[in-house]
Amino acid sequence: MNNYPKLHNAMWPGLVGKGPDSEPPISLDTMLELTAAANVGGQRFEGVDLFLASPHTSIDSTPDEIKALAGKLAGYGFAAGSLVAPVWPPTGGGSAMGSEEERRAFLTQVRKACSIGRQLKDLGIRPSGVVRIDSACSVHDWAADPEGNQKKIAATFREACDIADGYGELLAAEGEICWGGMQGWKKMVNLLEMVGRPEHIGFQADMAHTLLYTLGYNAPEDRIVPEDFNWDEAGLASALRTLTK
């Protein structure tokens, strides 16, 4: 048995960027079929990370629907891993720095996501994984009051940690440069330090956004590499060490 990280395919590309003004969504069944068919040199995906939003997996799924989902994943030999909580206003959530009502909506979606995560664990299909969140607000709106808004986001995240702890779940703030208070690596570190709950919330980011952090794309003051950076291996390694130390 190896100790390498498990290779999971994310399901959210089937929904993100899709819709009436773009290409149609890719169904969860199709995403699972494509994931199962992928094979590079004998390496296959061992699981999937789920987007808890319709038309894939409704955040309001019933226990029977979650059980059916677990059975479907098991049929492919997949484990469930990370879960994306739909914390944004268009999916029923609200800004983490918004009004009391908006923040309550944000936390409601976190609670529902943690409940689904717990159910999947109890069904034996999800041995590990986090619940992914972000600030659900734009960089532009955040910039109207950086200090005050960062405090509000941190307070909302702390409440989210309390919710996750009640379900035995862990949270991860998704490092994407489009989210207010998270648009630069120093701001992301600052936010996590303000939350002050490292036992309950961590950080995750795809490689593209990790590289955008080093470039300071949405936060030039946090840029690590020089403006004329040419992606040399040594320079990139140094930047990533700075980012992750």
List the predicted regions and their residue ranges.
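Active-site groove signature of glycoside hydrolases
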Residues: 114-146, 167-178
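Adenine-nucleotide cofactor-binding loop residues
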Residues: 208
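Glycine-rich, phosphate-binding/catalytic loops in enzymes
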Residues: 65, 149, 188-190, 220-222
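N-terminal pre-domain/capping segments
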Residues: 1-127, 147-150, 155-165, 197-205, ...
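Basic- and aromatic-lined ligand-binding clefts that recognize polyanionic substrates
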Residues: 166-196
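Histidine/acidic-residue-rich catalytic or RNA/ligand-binding cores of hydrolases
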Residues: 185, 214-220
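Surface-exposed cleft-lining segments at the edges of enzyme active sites
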Residues: 97-101, 138-148, 173-180, 218-228
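Short, small-residue-enriched loops and turns at beta-alpha junctions
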Residues: 55-58, 90, 138-140, 177-181, ...
